[in-house]
A protein has these predicted regions:
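Polar/acidic, low-complexity leader/linker segments enriched in S/T/G and N/D
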Residues: 1-20
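C-terminal edge-of-domain segments
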Residues: 3-7, 32, 191
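Short, solvent-exposed beta-alpha or beta-beta edge segments that form flexible loop/patches at the rim
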Residues: 23-35
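Oligomerization/assembly interface segments of phage tail-like spikes and tubes
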Residues: 33-54, 178-198
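Ser/Thr/Pro- and often Gln-rich low-complexity regulatory segments
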Residues: 54, 159-169
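Autoprocessing Asn-cyclization modules and mimics
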Residues: 57, 62-143
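Short solvent-exposed strand/turn elements
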Residues: 137-163, 187-198
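Low-complexity, intrinsically disordered Gly/Pro/Thr-rich segments
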Residues: 167-181
Length: 198
């Protein structure tokens, strides 16, 4: 629950889900662009809450120290403070895969009970994707190639039901600023979490 707490009480969050794209400009001024096929992992840079009271959060800090940069954690955005990030804008509340998708596809055939809006979040076989264009619900385009080989009928989780499996790429150290009967925690930098793709 340690990394989840850092997400829940953050001061700010930067999100990177950009594709790997290379650009080359020739002397003539023409530009060449190429996209490299990668998993396009989610990366979250979290500015942690400053001045947490150490006697109240030392168990959380210990759990962070235990996981360090080695062990992953499932992060949910379903809390009241964070649900705005993944909340559905479309009307769909349930969906399954309609057929087995091709490897690395970016289009999914679905059986769903509603529509999807660009920017909606879905999760297939443990990996989260963003919908790239409005859809009536039978076929959706996703922002990155499908990871793995899910079977026909696989449940597709929507919106706040999506969870991100992340590992800390960067775990900051902290300074304790003494006060009466304790100290405030001051982090030396941001946490960086990268999607853990297996």
């Amino acid at each position: 629950m340690s990394f989840q707490t850092i997400f829940d009480i953050q001061q700010s969050m930067a999100v990177n889900n950009r594709r790997m794209v290379g650009q080359q400009v020739a002397r003539s001024g023409y530009i060449t662009v190429a996209q490299y096929l990668t998993a396009v992992p989610w990366v979250f840079t979290i500015q942690p809450h400053a001045y947490l009271y150490y006697p109240q959060v030392r168990d959380i800090i210990q759990t962070i120290d235990n996981k360090d940069r080695q062990l992953p954690e499932q992060i949910s955005f379903a809390s009241t403070n964070l649900q705005w990030f993944v909340k559905m804008r479309g009307t769909a509340t349930a969906a399954t895969l309609n057929g087995a998708p091709a490897a690395n596809t970016q289009t999914l055939a679905l059986n769903s009970n509603g529509t999807f809006k660009a920017g909606d979040f879905i999760m297939v076989s443990g990996y989260v994707y963003k919908i790239t264009a409005d859809s009536a619900g039978s076929s959706v385009s996703i922002h990155r190639p499908l990871i793995g080989t899910p079977a026909s009928g696989t449940t597709v989780f929507l919106g706040t039901a999506c969870t991100f499996n992340v590992v800390a790429e960067s775990c900051p150290t902290y300074t304790l600023n003494p006060m009466t009967d304790g100290a405030f925690v001051q982090w030396d930098s941001a946490f960086v979490f990268r999607e853990y793709i297996t």
